[in-house]
Amino acid sequence: MELRKPVSQEEARAKTTAWALTFADLTTLLLTFFVLLLVILNDAESHVDRWVNVILDETEKELRVLQQSTLVDIERVTKGIKITLTGAKLFKSLSADLNPDADPILVQIGGLIRTSTLMNIYNQKRWAPLLDMIARAQDTLNIEIRCEGHTDDKPIPMNSKFRNNWELSSARSLNLVQRLSELAEMDEHYFSALGYGEFRPKIDLRNINDRVKLEEARAENRRVEIYFDAFIKSKNESLENI
């Protein structure tokens, strides 16, 4: 009968720990796979975001014609395209009712938004690959027209129907988006309204001592900003909001 060769402690230890080494290798490979998967997904997401920014840049150029009016300023910002309207031309003092004289510029803004590249990407073949990428990821492209109202720092009189500048700025932005939606003949689900009162001034008034310059700065702060933006909403975000 053949005698078994004695096994040293080192050999026995190596055999008993061999599975652990194999398991560690598999774990490392799985970790590497998931890291690569995350990199690929992030790269795809960045690619989509870059294309959305290209669309916004193109749309901003289309809206530049609005700057021919002294009432309007256009700026490309991180929150999309910002259209700034001077408050004094839109509303009377302490009123949230739109001046009828503002209708022509609102008609122009609404028309340009309605016919813009961003609002018509589903009708243009050149954006089909982008829309296909978004659909395959089960994401959605959200288009938003958000109005933000701002006032100056003067307190609201006691006899006003508004309790404070928050209420006044909110009422103004709401009236503006409702009117813009009507004139542009666009669905209301694109629009939203916010009011910031005097708390997000365009010009800081604290270091202005000259009365004339102070009133000029206050006039700059009385404004309405319309943000025309697009962003990708992931499937997971939609599920979280249910």
Model-predicted segments: where are they?
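Short amphipathic alpha-helical segments
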Residues: 47-51, 55, 101, 105, ...
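Short, hydrophobic/amphipathic alpha-helical packing segments
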Residues: 56, 106-114, 173-177
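Short, solvent-exposed beta-strand/turn patches at coil↔beta or beta↔helix junctions
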Residues: 79-123, 154-163
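Periplasmic OmpA-like peptidoglycan-binding domain that tethers envelope proteins to the cell wall
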Residues: 100, 126-242
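Short terminal targeting/anchoring segments
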Residues: 1-86
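Extracytoplasmic beta-rich ectodomain segments of secreted or membrane-anchored proteins
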Residues: 61-70, 99-142
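Envelope-exposed proteins and targeting segments
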Residues: 68-70, 77-81, 85-89, 94, ...
